[in-house]
Amino acid sequence: ALRSNMDYLITDENLIKKGEEKFYSEKLIYMPDIWNSLSKPKNLPEIDLNICKNNKTFTFGSLSNFQKISVETIKVWSNILNNTNSKLILKSSINNSNDLKKNLYEKFLKENVNPEKIEVFDRVENQKNHLEFYNKFNLTLDTFPYPGVTTSFESVLMGKPFLTMRGNNFNSRCGESININLGLKDFIATDENDYYEKALKFYKDSNKISKMGQQLREHALNSPLLDVKKFSKNFYDKLYEIYTSH
């Protein structure tokens, strides 16, 4: 149980799979497609494909909260960086994050990563500038065991697919559910070794990744991820079922 005073839990079939209901004291409310939906940002920047084309170095990126960058994540990311001619872009989600940035660099140094391969940016104050950061890299790397949610929605909206890890519970499967709803199962790794192998595969096929840009945005906009009207209707129907059952 998450909380003793919570009766229902909103989920989908990708987050809590059949047979796992017994692990929850709450009554599970399964949404038809996905447990969450995002409204299209008002100031959605253009996708700049030229940045990726002009980059001589393949660039990975993650705009997730630094707290989600686990020791396991750093080890796998370091392995990727140490075995490719690539770099990694990270961005803080809080102000005055110098100590956090220093701590991150130290963790990568312990894995023998050249610090010049990592760029860590400060928080930006408006959404448009934040979203424009996705134009700086080729592929988003998701964190694990706790993946990004909003940043994953943002990534595909900005034409950048994200590589995520298959989880073993609700919280660790959010990226999996998002990619399944987009039909991007190839971007779901089964374990740390598969994550590494997939990252190398996409690194070697950078042209394919770059070409996904505008098409991926349109696909996301027409998927359950951004269909807030359909999600609202489904959510209302679920609430009405709960109300009428009492």
What are these model-derived regions, one by one?
Residues 1-43:
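Active-site-proximal region of nucleotide-activated glycan assembly enzymes
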Residues 3, 131-134:
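A short, aliphatic-rich alpha-helical micro-motif
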Residues 33-126, 133-135:
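Conserved catalytic-core segment of nucleotide-activated headgroup transferases in glycan assembly
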Residues 64-66, 82, 86, 90-107, ...:
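C-terminal amphipathic helix plus adjacent low-complexity
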Residues 124-128, 147-148:
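Short acidic loop-to-helix transition motifs that present clustered carboxylates
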Residues 134, 143-225:
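Catalytic binding pocket for nucleotide-activated donors in carbohydrate/polymer assembly enzymes
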